[in-house]
């Protein structure tokens, strides 16, 4: 961060640290209120600062208050911090905040975001160097979807770059962006990435969710593809389970129940139970209530899953009926653990009021 000495009202140069602290305090004072003209002028001057931290603070105010009148200054600052970036903007603090402000101000110039998308910033760390521009590339990846002048083919061609980025967080943003583009081409691109089976679980999860969110006429085939990963190792299987749950689709629920009935270890059984209840479909709740009644070993997992999502008095009453039909002490103890009498929504809590 580079700083120039400020001049006080008396004309005497102020110490750098005092100048910085004063400017920072003035900016932070505007966080909770809409800035007046004097405040906007301060933000404008801060955007022109050489200090990347102050610029980041100013950019945050531009974004929070939607200060469209400062778009030109925000763009100029963004450009400036690509010059000698390791020295002028370590950790990409300024560029990260500035690009978020540009998105908030509805800047749709693709050239702005392409510059950020293709920027890497290797900074010295213990034992070598580390790229600090991953967040910037991820934000620019998402921003490109809303840009003007990019057709579907051109946009997907660009998004191939972040889909192969070394940073998994950027690859996740790329998958989400491709999902937002939609259409058959986007679906095929995501399907190819999934079928390679060479991705980290979190990125696979983003691909699953994006693929399942695309309306392209082959919903059953997509659900079947993702369901195939329920047997593909712990973390990848968990990502598949929760991606299926997000669809709230009866076919996705059927795939989850089918896999649950095949048996699983304690951890993955719990994952499946949580995914089933997260579909928020009545058939899923009915299945888990049946588990409580008929499977003493799996009942605690089903009880915990239901309790994490539903705590209403109505649901508690239904669960209590299934527990009573189970006629098992272990199941009863698990019910008391996950549905305590004092829990919000329980009959006892209503009586206490």
Predicted features, each with a name:
Residues 73-80, 97-104, 112-115, 139:
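Generic beta-strand or strand-like secondary-structure segments
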Residues 42-46, 73-86, 115-128, 158-166, ...:
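Alpha-solenoid HEAT/Armadillo-like helical repeat scaffolds in large eukaryotic proteins
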Residues 36-40, 71, 110, 114, ...:
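Core helices of alpha-solenoid repeat scaffolds
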Residues 49:
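Glycine/alanine-rich phosphate-binding loops at beta-alpha junctions
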Residues 310, 351-352:
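Domain-scale selection of a single, long terminal region
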Residues 7-8, 242, 254, 284, ...:
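Short stretches within intrinsically disordered, low-complexity N-terminal or propeptide regions
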Residues 11-35, 53-68, 88-107, 126-150, ...:
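Structural detector for internal amphipathic alpha-helices that build alpha-solenoid repeat scaffolds
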């Amino acid at each position: 961060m580079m700083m120039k000495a400020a001049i006080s009202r008396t004309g005497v140069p102020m110490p750098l640290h005092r100048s910085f602290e004063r400017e920072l305090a003035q900016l932070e004072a505007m966080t909770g209120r809409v800035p007046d003209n004097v405040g906007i002028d301060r933000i404008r001057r801060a955007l022109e600062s050489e200090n990347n931290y102050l610029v980041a603070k100013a950019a945050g105010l531009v974004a929070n208050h939607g200060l469209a009148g400062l778009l030109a200054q925000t763009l100029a600052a963004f450009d400036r911090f690509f010059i000698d970036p390791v020295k002028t903007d370590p950790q990409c603090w300024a560029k990260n905040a500035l690009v978020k402000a540009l998105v908030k101000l509805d800047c749709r110039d693709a050239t702005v975001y392409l510059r950020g998308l293709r920027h890497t910033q290797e900074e010295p760390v213990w034992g070598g160097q580390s790229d600090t521009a991953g967040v910037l590339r991820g934000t620019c990846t998402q921003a490109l979807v809303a840009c003007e002048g990019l057709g579907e083919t051109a946009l997907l061609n660009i998004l191939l770059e972040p889909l192969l980025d070394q940073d998994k967080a950027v690859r996740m943003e790329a998958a989400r962006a491709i999902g937002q583009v939609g259409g058959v081409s986007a679906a095929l691109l995501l399907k190819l990435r999934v079928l390679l089976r060479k991705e980290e679980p979190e990125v696979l999860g983003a691909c699953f969710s994006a693929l399942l969110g695309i309306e392209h006429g082959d919903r059953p085939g997509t659900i079947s593809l993702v369901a195939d990963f329920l047997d593909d190792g712990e973390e990848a299987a968990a990502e598949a389970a929760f991606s299926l749950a997000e669809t709230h689709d009866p076919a996705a629920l059927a795939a989850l129940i089918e896999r649950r009935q095949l048996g699983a270890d304690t951890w993955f059984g719990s994952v499946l139970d949580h995914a089933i209840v997260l579909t928020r479909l009545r058939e899923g709740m009915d299945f888990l209530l049946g588990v409580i009644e008929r499977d003493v070993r799996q009942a605690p997992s089903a009880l915990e899953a239901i309790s994490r999502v539903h705590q209403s008095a109505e649901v508690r009453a239904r669960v209590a009926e299934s527990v009573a039909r189970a006629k098992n002490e272990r199941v009863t103890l698990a019910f008391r653990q996950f549905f305590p009498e004092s829990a919000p929504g329980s009959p006892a809590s209503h009586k206490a009021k």
